[in-house]
């Protein structure tokens, strides 16, 4: 059966049909209006473009990243996705979202097909309505709504519901697709349509013609007349899957139409290694057919004919036929709004079926290895952790040539693709490696008093003593851009603090990161904790990593302000330590020393302009304008080829001035600086609080009282007097190295070294103590005596 909705006459037809559909199928409070289905260009975050799609159907895709090349896609909507929780009526919000995503992909030039359930649920609601209308007023009042539901549902035969619901279901799909100027066509099939050669050819030809005409076929089993399912059999020497449910229908259709991708939406996140909900159930990211023995299936979903086992069998059959398959959740409110488009973009959603066995451990497995290795690190003696770090420092100098050779490859590949500041961060040198080695040895020396240090001791009562001790945070995820020197720094801090570590570097530093990680694991191997630090594959998307809240305890981003903001937005369940911007200020007071100012400005701005602690805004007291000191500052900046941007007040003082700055809240990261004029130290502080990023701010003055006022009132992580902003650094602070700079208000702030990667736990030692002993009539009293903290001997 083929029902084609033509473009001509759609609007009058929809106006006649939609009120009928709503009145029969949808309660008044839940009715969908055409205006409520927003246009794709204003609602979706998927680019509205035509993507280059030239894939010829053959082998299925090997990796998720290749799914963006899929041209022909089948989306199967399970009963649990389409229907409401009461199994009587449709989930209109989810359907509208699915239709929009399918429309987005269709308008990108892809060929979309839907295999949908929902006719039975739609018909069940309509027939309930008919039963209600056929009752007398006395019967209706007597039965009540709840009694009607109990009475009507058992006697409604599924085939009758399907017959009553098909037309309404298609009318609803038509109304939704019309909002995106897309036509849809309904095709009802049975198993016989695939077994009869002539019918197969007719079906195939019809579908191809619809796709050629840019029409979305909506396919469903003809449940009103469907015969009992037949066993899988051979058809002309080819193993075929019998159409038992919409899972098998979708698989059969995908292979028959040589589809690139089959997306199966259900009410679970994907395929688990054991029934979802069980304590040890883990979502399988990539399923390889050879791993079937590792999966235990549970019961089927609350509605529909198939369960997860049926979906997997259908998926494997489609995969064998050359179609890639993803099983995902189409009901979860946090992900269902973009689940289809996210899958096509290659994001880590659901379970991806691949004929290529995953190489190496998954990121989840790497996280577990890092946690286990971190716990082993924490149990090592302080001297052993220090020995690992010192060995890594030696390797950095001993293997200098290999490291620089790998870094040279990265620089050559990045030439012309990366901006100058990023290339500077990417570059390694002999001096950088020597500085790294020195910093690592400082960390090794300080690590001996990190893990297990007693911070507080309290005698709660007689023979009941409490201790607060330092412990590792757990598993850290450090994401860094273009800075391979970050890897050994962070690794050393993780080793010293006993934390497991996942490292995610940018692909621009892949060669450098690989060799540095190998050297790190070589150092860890001397005490058998090689797995504590893992380098995450560059294929892993940062957004996907930020969802691993059961594995990762803290995320530390090292990179651009945009990277930090993106991670803070994505990591809703995991704390993020870092700063999104490094807008550092220097205020030159009216009593500043002429000899000091130019040195401080030059060092803060020109020594390393790409650093997050480089000067970005120079605030100058009004009294210094048109003075020799001001002229010296301007001349020095010109000699250093620093581009000057004028703030609004500064521009007003000049007849001919640099272009006025577009924003006073700008991190340039290059040889550019904003100059603004202020009337007082208080105005400078107010400016910093309004436009700064709470990173590092400096005052240059010879007036101690003014300086102390500035130091006490500026609310930034680092506040300096007569010192360069570039001192805001873990190595220069004597921390050995830093894992990053934090501008947050809790836990660590400023340059974060070893102490920032530790938390605490409480140890209580008693002798059969119970709370009732301390009641009004109990035998014990609280003492709460402070006890001396033992000093550990590290000599």
Curated annotation (Swiss-Prot):
Enzyme Commission code(s) on record: 2.7.2.11, 1.2.1.41
Gene Ontology CC terms: mitochondrial inner membrane; mitochondrial matrix; mitochondrion
UniProt entry tagged with the keyword DNA repair: no
Chain sites annotated for binding substrate: 117, 223, 246
Activity regulation annotation text: Isoform Short: Inhibited by L-ornithine with a Ki of approximately 0.25 mm. Isoform Long: Insensitive to ornithine inhibition. Thus, the two amino acid insert in the long isoform abolishes feedback inhibition of P5CS activity by L-ornithine.
Keywords, comma-separated and alphabetical: Amino-acid biosynthesis, ATP-binding, Kinase, Mitochondrion, Multifunctional enzyme, NADP, Nucleotide-binding, Oxidoreductase, Proline biosynthesis, Transferase
Function comment: Bifunctional enzyme that converts glutamate to glutamate 5-semialdehyde, an intermediate in the biosynthesis of proline, ornithine and arginine.
Name of the protein this chain belongs to: Delta-1-pyrroline-5-carboxylate synthase
Gene this chain is encoded by: Aldh18a1
